[in-house]
């Protein structure tokens, strides 16, 4: 009987996403992948995490994944825009995502870029930077802390964890947000009846 031979891996098996071993530590969320666009691997991106969708035109590379610590690096191949009822949607082409199946595999994931690539000024903030900040009224009454930031079709929302350990939603618009105090890491809000109701 011949000796047993070592099994070899099946090269045809799908290894899954090639997540970066050591992702950059300065990743900032710049978009969210709605779904594929067409059959050639293009992606529909919600760019509301950045104040300027045109940033994508100057980015050489982005990182795609469910979390900034678990991402895949992609060079940007193409950028164009589409007007929708919700505003501007970015149609993004990425190297390595070449057909609809590839695009489906990354749908509903986030898109990140490094602070260095974005050329952020020292005083520039993204919504994710505000998680953990204190929310207070003009009179200084603590309303809670920012637990999350939600990008919604009508308007973006801050999710606030109240002192009673409930969640409240604050629209991220000028009618509600009076001041964003970076030095104190707090957001000053205008109290409106029902605003902080869970």
UniProtKB/Swiss-Prot annotation:
It is found in: Cytoplasm. One of its GO terms (cellular component) is cytoplasm. Disulfide bonds: none annotated. Binds ribosomal protein uS19. Belongs to the RimM family. Pfam families: PRC_RimM, RimM. This is Ribosome maturation factor RimM. GO terms for molecular function: ribosome binding. Keywords: Chaperone, Cytoplasm, Ribosome biogenesis, rRNA processing. The PRC barrel domain binds ribosomal protein uS19. An accessory protein needed during the final step in the assembly of 30S ribosomal subunit, possibly for assembly of the head region. Essential for efficient processing of 16S rRNA. May be needed both before and after RbfA during the maturation of 16S rRNA. It has affinity for free ribosomal 30S subunits but not for 70S ribosomes. InterPro entries: PRC_barrel-like_sf, PRC_RimM, RimM, RimM_N, RimM_N_sf, Transl_B-barrel_sf. Gene3D superfamilies: PRC-barrel domain (2.30.30.240), RimM (2.40.30.60). SUPFAM superfamilies: PRC-barrel domain (SSF50346), Translation proteins (SSF50447). Residues 1-21 are annotated as: Disordered. Residues 122-195 form the PRC barrel domain. One of its GO terms (biological process) is ribosomal small subunit biogenesis.
């Amino acid at each position: 009987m011949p000796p047993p031979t070592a099994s070899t891996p099946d090269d045809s098996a799908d290894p899954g996403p090639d997540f970066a071993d050591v992702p950059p530590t300065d990743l900032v969320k710049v978009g969210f992948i709605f779904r594929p666009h067409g059959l050639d691997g293009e992606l529909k991106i919600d760019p509301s995490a950045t104040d300027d969708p045109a940033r994508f035109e100057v980015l050489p590379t982005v990182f795609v994944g469910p979390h900034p610590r678990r991402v895949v690096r992609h060079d940007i191949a193409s950028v164009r825009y589409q007007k929708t009822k919700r505003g501007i949607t970015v149609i993004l082409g990425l190297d390595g995502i070449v057909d609809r199946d590839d695009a489906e595999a990354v749908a509903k994931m986030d898109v990140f870029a490094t602070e260095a690539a974005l050329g952020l000024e020292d005083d520039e903030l993204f919504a994710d930077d505000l998680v953990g900040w204190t929310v207070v009224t003009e009179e200084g009454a603590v309303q809670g802390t920012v637990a999350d930031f939600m990008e919604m079709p009508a308007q973006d929302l801050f999710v606030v964890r109240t002192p009673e350990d409930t969640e409240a939603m604050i629209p991220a618009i000028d009618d509600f947000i009076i001041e964003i105090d970076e030095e104190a890491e707090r957001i000053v809000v205008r109290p409106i009846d029902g605003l902080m109701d869970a």
